[in-house]
Regions:
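Short loop/turn and low-complexity linker motifs enriched in small/turn-promoting residues
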Residues: 19-162
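Sec-dependent N-terminal signal peptides
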Residues: 4-16
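N-terminal hydrophobic targeting signals that begin at the initiator methionine
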Residues: 1-3, 22
Length: 162
């Protein structure tokens, strides 16, 4: 009899840990952002008093005009989980040049050789490389903090005068 009671108390304790729910609050900047938990939309931020089970979970945070964010979280049995997310805006940017024979590369991802290109870029620093005949001739960091048009000119050496 003692073994049965002992087993039941251990089972009840363990099942309480496994199946217990943890309080979840999610804040975002900006607000009114769609929050997906394990592929299910749980609403728009801020999220208050939602319940989440212990274990591994994936959050996906999405809002038009902002870079999407994915976040994996291992939830331990606890009293509460509070998450704060800051989404980076996406800006429409144009790159223009009158120079001929150049190839541009941004962040090792985007490449172009035309005189005008439009890109949607996440706010922050981006690496621009400029190639001519397969060799890097310029490299610079561009800070994107608003919609902007970037005009590229080759740096010309100063000529010596007599």
């Amino acid at each position: 009899m003692f073994k049965i009671i002992n087993f039941l108390s251990i089972f009840t304790f363990c099942s309480g840990i496994i199946f217990s729910q943890v309080k979840l609050d999610v804040n975002t900047i900006p607000t009114k952002v769609d929050i997906h938990l394990d592929g299910v939309n749980i609403g728009s931020s801020p999220i208050r008093n939602e319940r989440i089970s212990p274990g591994l979970h994936r959050f996906e945070i999405k809002k038009k005009g902002y870079a999407p964010l994915s976040y994996d979280l291992l939830v331990n049995p606890a009293q509460a989980v509070e998450l704060d997310f800051f989404l980076n805006p996406i800006y429409e940017c144009k790159f223009k040049t009158d120079e001929k024979g150049l190839v541009f590369e941004l962040n090792g991802e985007h490449r172009w050789d035309v005189d005008l290109v439009r890109l949607r870029l996440e706010a922050g620093d981006h690496l621009l490389r400029v190639f001519k005949i397969g060799e890097i001739i310029d490299e610079q960091i561009i800070n994107v903090d608003q919609p902007k048009k970037y005009n590229y000119f080759l740096k010309k050496p100063l000529s010596a005068s007599n």
